[in-house]
Design a protein with these regions (language model features):
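Conserved HGGG/HGGXW glycine-rich cap/lid loop of the alpha/beta-hydrolase fold
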Residues: 6-68, 82
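Helix-rich cap/lid subdomain of alpha/beta-hydrolase
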Residues: 126-182, 197-199
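Glycine-rich His-Gly loop
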Residues: 28-31, 97, 222
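Active-site loop/turn elements of alpha/beta-hydrolase fold enzymes
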Residues: 57-59, 122, 250
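Conserved hydrolase catalytic core segment
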Residues: 89-128
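Conserved acidic catalytic loop of the alpha/beta-hydrolase fold
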Residues: 74-91
Length: 274
């Protein structure tokens, strides 16, 4: 059965979400340039065993960012409110990239809502800012980010999206290496890339914070991902007390989009043990 697409008003905003399946709830949180459709390759597989909800973050498709607040703090508060509004907790919470950062922050402060945690390359570069090995790749990352930001400042949003994806999916063929449906979706969310450069930094998250998260956690990483992503995952695995790790073959950062078969199998195997 195909997913139903619905809307719910939370925190003064109408959130669009896809819902499918029955059983223990699994909530999917997409990353930068994504929306609920990012998880199209996961919905059927996950819904065969679980009640799956994939939602679009505030200002993401079918909405757009036209100015105003856009922040980790706001998205974290939205997710907590959404879980309460849909009466879903405790849930298996799956977050990718920006969404992984949101997920781990919710787990830190609202453990009562979380049954287990799946973090697919959660990304806050500041987590490894003091790791010596990370300094060269971080410098390269910031150099490219500056180019992306310059595109957004000139209103060249498509170019910004392409440059951004050429970086984070470099080993996977860049923007053009993505399935066409995801290319289209990212371009439709291009205003959120401009919003992200105007947003405040994420809340502080330290190794000590991570060590207090008792939730069973799976850290998922693409075989072809950037070195800095791997170093972030290493730090999480070092600090969090109940962590498993899995490597998704033939995938860089957008792992659930380019290799859903192996991604889904790894996540479902982990969830079955919880």
């Amino acid at each position: 059965m195909a997913a139903d697409t619905k809307q719910i008003n939370v925190n003064g905003t109408a959130f669009t979400y896809a819902e499918q399946g029955q059983g223990v709830p699994v909530v999917l949180v997409h990353g930068s340039l994504g929306d609920y459709r990012t998880w199209s390759g996961e919905m059927d597989d996950f819904a065969a065993r679980y009640h799956v909800v994939a939602y679009s973050l505030r200002n993401h498709y079918p909405d757009t960012w036209t100015g105003g607040p856009y922040s980790y703090q706001g998205h974290i508060a939205d997710l907590v409110a959404l879980l309460h509004a849909l009466n879903l907790g405790p849930v298996h919470l799956v977050g990718h990239s920006y969404g992984g950062t949101i997920a781990v922050m919710v787990a830190k402060d609202h453990s009562e809502l979380i049954r287990s945690l799946v973090l697919a390359e959660p990304g806050v570069a500041s987590w490894v800012a003091n790791v010596e090995e990370a300094k060269p790749p971080l410098a390269e990352l910031f150099k490219v980010a500056k180019v992306v930001q310059e595109h957004t400042q000139k209103g060249e949003l498509d170019e910004a999206v392409i440059s951004f994806m050429d970086l984070i999916n470099e080993a996977g063929g860049g923007f053009k290496g993505l399935p066409v449906a995801f290319q289209t979706g990212m371009l439709q969310n291009s205003t959120t890339l401009k919003a992200s450069f105007a947003s405040p930094p994420p809340p502080t998250f330290t190794c000590d914070d991570a060590s207090k998260i008792g939730t069973p956690t799976l850290v998922v990483e693409g075989e072809l991902t950037l070195k800095v992503r791997r170093l972030i995952d290493n730090e999480l695995a070092r600090c969090m007390p109940h962590v498993e790790r899995v490597l998704i073959p033939r995938a860089a950062h957008p792992l659930e989009m380019v290799n859903p078969k192996d991604f889904n199998a790894a996540v479902l195997q982990f969830l079955a043990k919880q």
